[in-house]
């Protein structure tokens, strides 16, 4: 089940929500374990886990086979994260990859491989060097997504 680690108020310090987020995710994980379900945390923009470091903190603190990563290249780029650094932090937790690319500060996504997501290099690493056997999803968002806009 793809899921997220809670929207954080726009002007708030995400780190101040660490304990609350961990407590809520532990509740989700208990339910997932009971039903033998894997929760896939996506690094969506604006949530607690939208940076590589906070995603790593979640996986380290919650260490559980029922809680894995859905790695979204574009979301990391749009959060001004280096995808290669994020991959290095998270590769052992990744079970699902979203093929979607972006340019920093750019509201629209761009075709895969044309942004700063380093998609070709990181997929080559995943499959050829690390033996990745998880899922891939082509997620070609090329229009403005403003579903959550006021």
What are these regions (language model features)?
Residues 30, 51-71, 76-150:
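Histidine-acidic metal/acid-base catalytic patches
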């Amino acid at each position: 089940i793809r899921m997220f680690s809670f929207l954080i108020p726009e002007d708030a310090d995400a780190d101040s929500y660490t304990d609350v987020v961990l407590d809520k995710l532990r509740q989700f994980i208990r339910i997932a374990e009971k039903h033998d379900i894997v929760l896939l945390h996506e690094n969506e923009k604006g949530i607690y886990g939208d940076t590589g470091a906070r995603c790593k903190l979640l996986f380290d603190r919650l260490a559980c086979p029922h809680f894995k990563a859905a790695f979204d290249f574009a979301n990391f780029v749009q959060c001004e994260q280096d995808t290669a650094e994020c991959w290095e932090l998270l590769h052992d937790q990744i079970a699902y990859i979203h093929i979607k690319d972006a340019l920093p500060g750019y509201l629209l996504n761009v075709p895969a491989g044309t942004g700063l997501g380093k998609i070709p290099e990181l997929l080559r690493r995943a499959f050829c060097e690390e033996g990745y056997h998880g899922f891939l999803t082509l997620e070609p968002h090329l229009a403005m997504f403003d579903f959550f806009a006021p």
